[in-house]
């Protein structure tokens, strides 16, 4: 995911430091998780506690860190005959999504040309809205477990930057269409590493959470500036 401060390219460097100085550690706490890339990576070796005050980050954590095995979506298969929710959303023709009510088109009404902005194309915004509403409908109808729900939300969130018309943050959009926006929006098939440990994800103020949990390794990667990350 393209996100300010993402540490994906530094994971091996962080691992080198961790294994050099904390050889006997059993747990790893990522108190400002962001894209959850660090916690997701260290789940291979540790029981992971992840946290972020931003709810989108919490969804990424719940869907890939606290969730300890790839969801099967058994109820969606049995009740709806949909073998793969990701294939269902990714392969559906955009014209089939036009039945979605206007009041449920949050992304199209606020972040596409139909809403006077150019963060997303109209068609990709509609694809996001359709998937988001359908996931909520399935959850309401008890067709999704908690892990399945958050996995799908995480898969949706992870796909948005790949079609967004931005330079790096959502503070502003390009005044022309970037080449990536021509691609069809797709939910991302996210890996889920099974470590059979009690991994936990939180959506709290990190300074307060540290008073309630304990662990061996504390990884701190706080915000870099005073600007709120949510608008980005």
Show the residue positions of the predicted features.
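Class I S-adenosyl-L-methionine-dependent methyltransferase module
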Residues: 47, 51-193, 226-232
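Conserved proline-anchored active-site loop of SAM-dependent methyltransferases
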Residues: 14, 28-41, 50-55, 215-231
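Short, basic, glycine/proline-bearing loop/turn elements
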Residues: 24-27, 187-197
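Short, contiguous clusters of charged residues that form electrostatic/catalytic patches at enzyme active sites
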Residues: 9-16, 126-133, 204
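S-adenosyl-L-methionine
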Residues: 1-32, 37-45, 58-60, 67
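Conserved SAM-binding strand-loop segment of SAM-dependent methyltransferases
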Residues: 198-205
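Residue-level recognition of the N-termini of beta-strands and the immediately preceding loop/turn
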Residues: 26-27, 148, 152, 199
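Short conserved loop adjoining the S-adenosyl-L-methionine
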Residues: 208-214
């Amino acid at each position: 995911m393209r996100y300010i401060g993402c540490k994906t390219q530094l994971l091996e460097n962080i691992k080198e430091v961790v294994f050099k100085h904390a050889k006997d550690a059993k747990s790893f706490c990522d108190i400002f998780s962001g894209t959850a890339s660090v916690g997701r990576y260290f789940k291979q070796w540790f029981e992971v506690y992840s946290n972020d005050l931003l709810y989108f980050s919490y969804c990424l954590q719940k869907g890939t860190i606290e969730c300890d095995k790839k969801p099967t979506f058994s109820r969606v298969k049995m009740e709806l005959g949909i073998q793969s929710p990701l294939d269902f959303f990714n392969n559906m023709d955009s014209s089939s999504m036009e039945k979605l009510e206007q009041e449920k088109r949050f992304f199209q009404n606020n972040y596409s040309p139909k809403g006077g902005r150019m963060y997303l194309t109209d068609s990709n915004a509609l694809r996001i809205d359709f998937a988001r509403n359908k996931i909520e409908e399935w959850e309401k109808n008890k067709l999704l477990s908690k892990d399945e729900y958050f996995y799908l939300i995480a898969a949706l969130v992870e796909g948005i930057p790949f079609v967004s018309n931005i330079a790096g943050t959502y503070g502003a959009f390009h005044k022309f269409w970037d080449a990536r926006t021509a691609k069809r929006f797709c939910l991302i098939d996210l890996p889920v590493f099974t470590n059979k440990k009690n991994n936990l994800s939180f959506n709290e103020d990190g300074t307060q959470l540290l008073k309630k949990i304990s662990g061996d390794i504390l990884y701190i990667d706080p915000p870099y500036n005073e600007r709120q990350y949510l608008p980005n």
